[in-house]
């Protein structure tokens, strides 16, 4: 029975080195102030509603004032997704 040939192994060549590329993380200047303002406005809206027993900020909304306050807070979280 004939012997099979041994295949010559290819010489090891290391992969080319990757150069680190700097990523520009340019955050928009307006994002952080708007985000914090939305959080504070939402929190203040809810606190004022509870402290005044529902007569402020908008009396005709009634308990929907809580939804408005949480809406401001949710908008703050929405704006926070733009922060880099």
From Swiss-Prot:
Origin: domain of life: Bacteria
Protein induction: Expression peaks immediately before the appearance of aerial hyphae.
Gene Ontology biological process terms in this record: cell division
Residues in compartment: Extracellular: 52-60
Keywords, sorted A to Z: Cell cycle, Cell division, Cell membrane, Membrane, Transmembrane, Transmembrane helix
Region of interest: Disordered: 1-20
Compartment(s) where it occurs, according to its Swiss-Prot or TrEMBL record: Cell membrane
Bilayer-spanning residue ranges: 31-51, 61-81
Effect of a null allele: Disruption causes precocious erection of aerial hyphae and early antibiotic production on glucose-containing solid media.
Homology family: Belongs to the CrgA family.
Role: Involved in cell division. Coordinates growth and cell division. May act as an inhibitor of Z-ring formation.
Record protein name field: Cell division protein CrgA
UniProt organism field: Streptomyces coelicolor (strain ATCC BAA-471 / A3(2) / M145)
